[in-house]
């Protein structure tokens, strides 16, 4: 876990990590969210409507933005305050995702960092883009 403090941050600072999406994560997220839409739970249905298989829950994929902020950029001293997300392409179980974030703006008055983030999968295909606002609670 990174421990960037406010005074350590600068525009252009980047962090990244990789994660693979597992069936176990899908099952757990489905139980927690209560979302039983067959697009996410029934691969045959998903194929019939034009996908390669069951589509990973968008908010499961988006949860990796929380990991980015809480563990990597800024890490320990961060509190996610807002996020705007665009889903660009579907994610499937077994995909390996690269989550990248870069600080694009710092507000001294609010001690808030704005992070431009994206998630891509193998081959570099972007699956999600986000703008994240993060409070930093340590000087």
Language-model regions, residue ranges each:
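Hot-dog-fold acyl-thioester-processing enzymes
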Residues: 1-78
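HotDog/MaoC-like acyl-thioester-processing domains
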Residues: 1-14, 91-139
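Short, intrinsically disordered/low-complexity patches at protein termini
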Residues: 39-41, 51, 64, 79-80, ...
């Amino acid at each position: 876990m990174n421990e960037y403090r406010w005074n350590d941050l600068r525009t252009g600072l980047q962090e990244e990590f990789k994660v693979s999406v597992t069936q176990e994560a899908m099952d757990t997220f489905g139980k927690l969210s209560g979302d039983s839409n067959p697009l996410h739970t029934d691969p045959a249905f998903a194929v019939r409507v034009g996908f390669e298989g069951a589509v990973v829950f968008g908010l499961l994929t988006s949860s990796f933005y929380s990991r980015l902020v809480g563990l990597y950029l800024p890490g320990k001293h961060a509190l996610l305050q807002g996020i705007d997300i665009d889903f660009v392409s579907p994610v499937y179980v077994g995909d390996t995702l690269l989550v990248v974030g870069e600080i694009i703006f710092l507000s001294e008055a609010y001690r808030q960092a704005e992070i431009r983030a994206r998630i891509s999968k193998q081959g570099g295909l972007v699956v999600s883009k986000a703008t994240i606002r993060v409070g930093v609670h340590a000087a």
